[in-house]
Amino acid sequence: MRRIGMAVLGLALITTPLVGQRSALREVHDGGSGSFGATFVVAQPLGAFRRNGDVAAGLSLFGVTSGGPLALRIDGSWMAYDAQYQGYGVSTLSQIGTIGAGPQLTLGQGALRIYGFATVGGSLFWSTASYGGCGCSGGDSFLDGHFTTTTSAGGGLLVGLSRGRTPIAIDLGARAVRHDRVSYVPAGGLTQNSDGSFTAREVETRVDMRVYQLGVSIGIR
């Protein structure tokens, strides 16, 4: 928590002097009104989550409020860290949903740009059961869920593919993510009972991840 907290503070201190120069910077570097995009994410479990979770994968959506050096970044992600087939058309899925916001600093012009960011937000750990194909009534069933706070810090590289009115770039990056202590169902922690109900085994730990992302960023002018 200390490392990510220091990263958040450090990025905030770096970007504060730029606020007063924002209009001048826009005159020199007209980067447009911001950008949005989507990335495919893969998360490597760290610490206690390495024992209780598994490699997670999912999608992330983000928006950046300015095309200049200093901007506000807002992003949300969904990833699944455990999927099990229980038999007879019943499967279970354990997931993490996260939303956060914070400063982003982008450096460089032209086809190659680098950026760094830090965010603070919240996350939900939840598990569902899907009864498709089993002849059971209903579709997905919510089994378990818990909220917690989350912080992240990371950076990446933007490789421009086109400019014009709608600039497009490949977005390649990584971040450290820390979810504060939370109760969740570990990998393999859902067991189906003879009556069709489920028993959920829970653990309570901090959840640390290293998340890698690859996607596309689309500029707004």
Regions found by a protein language model. Give the residues of each.
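Predominantly the C-terminal beta-signal and adjacent terminal strand-loop region
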Residues: 160-221
